[in-house]
Design a protein with these regions (language model features):
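Helix-loop-helix hairpins in multi-pass membrane proteins, especially solute transporters
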Residues: 85-226
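Interfacial helix-cap and linker-helix signal at transmembrane-aqueous boundaries
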Residues: 59-60, 91-92, 124, 176-184, ...
């Protein structure tokens, strides 16, 4: 009689117990330094990317390059971040997170130190790409350390601080860059990172333990699939980032980038199905909550464009500089530490992390609706209260999102093996990058199209021969005649003034439409939260499980 074998899948409680037993219970000095390294690594990458975007005009002036050439600088950095995200899984599994982080951090600090001294455009692009490749390892590898070495009672605080520093770096960058340019020099947009990174390196050296040699997998990991996927994602991102400037499908460069990137991604998928790779064996990706969390992370990154694009651009159209825009955006960062501490306490008090997400997205939607009352007379001070509410919403939403992602990793088996933790981190890291960058592309295209629409609609009411239009031109011409070379010059200047007013009003209306789009994206995210299944346990239960597992080990000893 033939015997049959039934393989029982581990329950969520068994997976949680195995994960808790593998994590140290006591918080020594080394994990404290490790937490600091995780936080600094998360913040410095985001801060550098924002600094490059804000200082693009200074970089172009430093090199003497055109607008089209300068547009590729930030694209090169972000494309490198997208490239290294999936490839970090292979590097981390091959050499270990600690070694990769130390090499990458050293290289990144040196590159940022010398970038302001470069006067060649091609060398600058190469240096920016190298900076993106080295700093792009910080996100997945530092989070990998946090998930494997931070005691579970302290994990909510680590998650809260991690989310706070990532979110805070976005909001504080305009004020910091404005202060650097006003009191020091624009070069500090890079030297800032070269000073912070060595501190992160010390935390990595003393805070991240040397990993033991991993068992050799039965199947040898292949780097080709990672290379195809990484290069494909990077090319697709570069195409989307430059699409508006290149006029989308009318450009051969855009078409070539999309076609080549799509082909490489398809090649990676074919290779994955034909020859499974031990480093990307991810059954948890097929789970309902994992899919919804990935989509939710995409929506959250899209909603961040309110502070990254909409608010700064609505002020920049009036001629505001970075140091004048900063006070409006920095209000989003003001409540972050307080909210992070409160959110961590709520998680330890058995609060469902989905409720934090829902509260955050609701606050962001309400703040976006308030910002949609924007008029052409608004200044930075008009954003203070709404951006404060936006900051509270962003903090709660991101902390709740990251906390739910970590719980999903615990109960789906994603954190049961070191290789799977790397894959888990890199998967959400890639979505985080694409969500933010693609979100910015979508919003930029949306605002541009809405501005054209509003310009055409407003132009229907401002036509030659209309008595209101003619009266306005004559009145402005009379006022400008004294400082013009003649009547025709005064009338041309008057037409230019009216055209500028129309453009300002059209742009203001398009920004309002952008705020409404963000509000609807928050509503869609709330629907995703409602569809998510509740985790079997919360963070308070995980702490108790870890204590029980430790007690059993001590009893056996």
């Amino acid at each position: 009689m033939a015997s049959s074998t039934i393989t029982l899948r581990p329950t969520p409680f068994q997976l949680a117990r195995a994960t808790a037993a593998a994590i140290p219970q006591q918080l020594s000095k080394s994990p404290l330094l490790g937490i600091l390294g995780v936080i600094m690594g998360a913040g410095v990458v985001t801060l550098t990317g924002r600094m490059i975007t804000l200082g693009l005009a200074d970089l172009k002036g430093h090199l003497g390059i055109s607008f089209d050439d300068g547009a590729w600088i930030s694209t090169a950095y972000n494309a490198a971040l997208v490239f290294i995200g999936p490839f970090t899984v292979y590097l981390g599994g091959l050499l270990g997170p600690r070694r990769i982080l130390f090499i990458a951090a050293t290289s990144f600090a040196l590159i940022c130190l010398f970038i302001p001294l470069i006067h060649s455009y091609s060398l600058l692009i190469m240096a920016v790409v190298l900076a993106g490749l080295t700093s792009g390892t910080f996100y997945p590898l530092t989070l990998t350390f946090a998930l494997r070495n931070i005691p579970l009672p302290y994990l909510p605080f680590t998650i809260a601080l991690y989310a706070t520093f990532v979110d805070g770096a976005v909001n504080i960058a305009p004020s910091l860059y404005g202060w650097y340019r006003e009191h020091l020099s624009w070069q500090w947009m890079f030297w800032n990172s070269s000073l912070i990174t060595p501190l992160m390196m010390l935390c990595i050296y003393y805070g991240i333990p040397k990993s033991t040699a991993a068992k050799k997998p039965r199947a040898t990991p292949s780097f080709a699939g990672f290379l195809y996927a990484s290069a494909g994602f990077a090319l697709v991102y570069a195409a989307l980032d430059q699409g508006e400037r290149l006029d989308w499908w009318r450009s051969g460069v855009f078409t070539a980038l999309i076609a080549s990137g799509s082909f490489l991604i398809l090649s990676a998928l074919v290779r994955r199905f034909r020859g499974p790779n031990p480093l990307v064996d991810m059954p948890y990706l097929r789970q309902w909550n994992t899919i919804l969390l990935g989509i939710g992370l995409f929506f959250f990154r899209f909603c961040l464009v309110t502070t990254i694009i909409l608010v700064p651009q609505s002020l920049a159209i009036h001629g505001f500089e970075a140091d004048q825009i900063g006070p409006a955006v920095i209000w989003s960062a003001t409540p972050l530490l307080l909210v992070a501490f409160a959110a961590a306490l709520l998680l330890l008090a058995k609060m469902d992390s989905r409720l934090l997400m829902a509260a955050g997205f609701a606050c962001m939607a309400f703040a976006s609706c308030l910002n949609a009352n924007l008029t052409s007379a608004w200044s930075a001070s008009n954003y203070y209260r709404t951006e404060l509410l936006m900051g509270v919403g962003q903090a709660f939403a991101f902390i709740g999102l990251v906390a739910t992602i970590v719980l999903q990793g615990v109960f789906s088996g994603g954190l049961s093996k070191p290789q799977w933790i790397l894959t888990f981190s890199a998967f959400f890291h890639t979505i985080r990058l694409f969500g933010g960058n693609v979100g910015a592309v979508i919003m930029g295209h949306f605002v541009a199209q809405r501005e054209k629409l509003h310009s055409n609609l407003l132009g229907l009411h401002v036509q030659s021969g209309n008595w209101i239009t003619d009266t306005s031109i004559h009145q402005l011409s009379a006022g400008l005649f004294a400082k013009s070379s003649g009547l025709s010059a005064a009338m041309s200047r008057a037409v230019g003034v009216i055209n500028g007013r129309l453009r300002l009003q059209a742009y203001t209306l398009s920004i309002n439409d952008g705020f409404y789009l963000v509000a609807w994206a928050c509503v869609a995210a709330l629907l995703l939260v409602a569809l998510m299944r509740k985790s079997p346990l919360n963070y308070a239960d995980l702490s108790a499980i870890q204590q029980q597992a430790t007690a059993r080990q001590e009893a056996k000893a």
